[in-house]
Structures are given as C-alpha cells and as structure tokens.
C-alpha cells in the first residue's frame, strides 16, 4: 500500500503540476531487507527491482522526467540503476574543497568518471546541503586562508573549469556560482555551531554586486553556455583525456575533449604561483581562448603555455560566441 501510494502521488504530481522529475532521499532504504551501516551499500537485487518499478512509473507518465537517487551504494548496483535510466548523486566535495583551498592532497578529480558507470549516470556535485561550502573552507583552512577575495574567486573559477567541462550531469548548489562562504554549521541566530545543520542560511543576492563574485558567476555562465551550445563536444564519446590527479598538480591539470569537428583543451593552475607548461593540442594552427584571444599552436604535442596563479585557460579550435 505504501508503494502504491507513493507511485500514485508521483504520477499525480507529474501530470497535474508538470514536475520535471524527482530526487529521492537515501534510496538505499528502499528495500525490505534488513541491513546495518556496514552492509547497506552492498548490492541488493530486491532494491534494484523496487527502484526500477518506481522509474517505470515516472518514465511511463513522462518520458522526459528525471529520477535522481541519493543512493551511495556499491558501483555494481549504481551502474545497473544508471543503465536503466536513473541518475545517482555522486559526491566530489572533498576533492574540490582541497583544490579550492590550494591543497594538492586528496584533490584527485578522476573519481568523477568510472568505466563501469554510464557518463550520464552520476550527478556529480562539489557542494550540497550535506557538505561544507568550498568557499568557506578557503577562509578557514589550506593555502588561501589569507588570500584576498579576488584570488579565492579565481581559484573557484578554476574548480568550475574542471567540473563543468566534464561530460555528464552536474549539480550546482545554491549560490555556489557566487562563492557562497557561510558554513554549513552557521546557525539561524547568526552564531557558528559545532555540527552540520539545516538552519536557514543568509540569502546573498548582494554577492552579485561584488566584482570578484560576479566574475565567478560569469565564469559559470560562460562554461554552461559553452556546454549548451556544443552538446556534441560534451558527450561521453568526446571525452579523450585528462590529467587531474595529485601528481599533475605542479605542472598544471589538463582535460581534452574532441568531437567530429570540434576540440577543447583546458589547462588549470591551482597553485599560488605562475606555471610554465607544455600542452598537448593534437594539431597546430589557431586556437581560441574564452576571452577571444588567439593562440597560434606551432607544437601540437607540447605547446608552451603560461598559466597565471589560481587560474585556468580554455582553448577551442573554433571561435566561442559569448
């Protein structure tokens, strides 16, 4: 009866209120099998059947509706659910907090992708209602504690360049595009608690009036427009290579996408000093930066490029209309 009640409500909301879809909380609990904290993430075939039934109802009612699961189970189960059409939350908070703070340890981005998971299966996120804000951690820990807002926002822009260019769905948590830096432990009365809480946090529309936060906002906007204008370049088949592990910190991180006719290269510097590096482009000729400047590539396998501190450069083999 409970399942029937929930499914009938989902159908009603989709038809009557035109919902775009649903995000179900802690779906590893959608089972009749007993488990504990250490076993709940193990593959549960009965849970897979239940969730597929839910998705069938949603998909039959509206084929375009999205069903997102906060699942956090083993890859074999998540992969099967993703192949059925569902999307699963994927937590990248630690990696992007570390890079956002200018700390190389535990900052590997490569966990965003897995050969056993469809590219559209994981909804990667840097922040959520359960996780600490990257911009807050910049002010409290790491190598940017004493940096100015201009530098911190540039670092967050470099984070975004290695987040939004990766094929697959992404979640941007509220005001992350403006560098929201109130802690998850901030309380409604204006004091700082000692634990995560869901108290209402200040709504900071005034961030848009700050030139550095607006600059971060514009970076997000530009990257998202690039994705929307060039879906072929951000499909899973277009993903060619990236070097985003801890060992790639000192010489700059790198990502390359390539569709039938379009190419994109991102190079990022998360350090507090300029780096000079050699970049693989794949072909010589003119490449275009997001700011409209042109780079004439003469060495396709190791073109010298200078990346300022806390910055990124994104190149395409076609002019980008911003």
Locate predicted features.
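Short, acidic/polar
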Residues: 1-15, 156-160
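Active-site groove signature of glycoside hydrolases
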Residues: 7-37
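Active-site-proximal helices and loops of the catalytic beta/alpha 8
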Residues: 26-126, 161-165, 176-262, 270-285, ...
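Extended catalytic-interface subdomain
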Residues: 129-131
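Aromatic-anchored helix/helix-loop segment that forms the rim or "lid"
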Residues: 137-160
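Solvent-exposed beta-strand/loop surfaces of large extracellular or lumenal domains
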Residues: 289-302
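C-terminal beta-strand-rich structural cap/linker in extracellular carbohydrate-active enzymes
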Residues: 299-322
């Amino acid at each position: 009866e409970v399942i029937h009640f929930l499914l009938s409500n989902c159908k009603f909301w989709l038809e009557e209120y035109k919902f775009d879809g649903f995000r179900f909380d802690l779906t590893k609990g959608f089972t009749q099998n007993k488990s504990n904290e250490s076993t709940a993430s193990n593959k549960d075939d009965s849970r897979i059947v239940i969730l597929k039934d839910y998705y069938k109802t949603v998909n039959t009612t509206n084929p375009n509706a999205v069903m997102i699961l906060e699942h956090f189970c083993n890859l074999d189960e998540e992969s099967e659910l993703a192949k059925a059409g569902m999307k699963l939350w994927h937590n990248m908070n630690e990696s992007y907090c570390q890079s956002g703070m200018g700390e190389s340890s535990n900052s590997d981005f490569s966990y965003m992708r897995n050969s056993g998971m469809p590219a559209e299966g994981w909804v990667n996120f840097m922040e959520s209602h359960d996780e600490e804000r990257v911009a807050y951690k910049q002010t409290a820990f790491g190598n940017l504690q004493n940096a100015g807002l201009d530098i911190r926002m540039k670092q967050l822009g470099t984070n975004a360049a290695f987040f939004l260019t990766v094929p697959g769905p992404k979640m941007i948590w509220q005001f992350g595009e403006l560098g929201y830096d109130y802690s998850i432990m901030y309380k409604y009365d204006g004091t700082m608690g000692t634990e995560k809480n869901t108290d209402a946090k200040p709504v900071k529309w005034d961030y848009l009036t700050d030139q550095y936060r607006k600059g971060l906002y514009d970076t997000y906007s530009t990257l998202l427009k690039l994705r929307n204008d060039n879906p072929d370049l951000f499909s899973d088949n277009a993903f060619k290579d990236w070097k985003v592990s801890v060992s790639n910190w000192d010489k700059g991180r790198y990502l390359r996408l390539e569709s039938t006719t379009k190419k994109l290269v991102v190079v990022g510097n998360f350090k507090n000093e300029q780096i000079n590096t050699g970049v693989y482009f794949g072909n010589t000729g003119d490449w275009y930066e997001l700011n409209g400047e042109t780079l004439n590539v003469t060495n396709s396998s190791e073109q010298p490029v200078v990346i300022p501190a806390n910055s990124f450069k994104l190149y395409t083999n076609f002019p980008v209309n911003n």
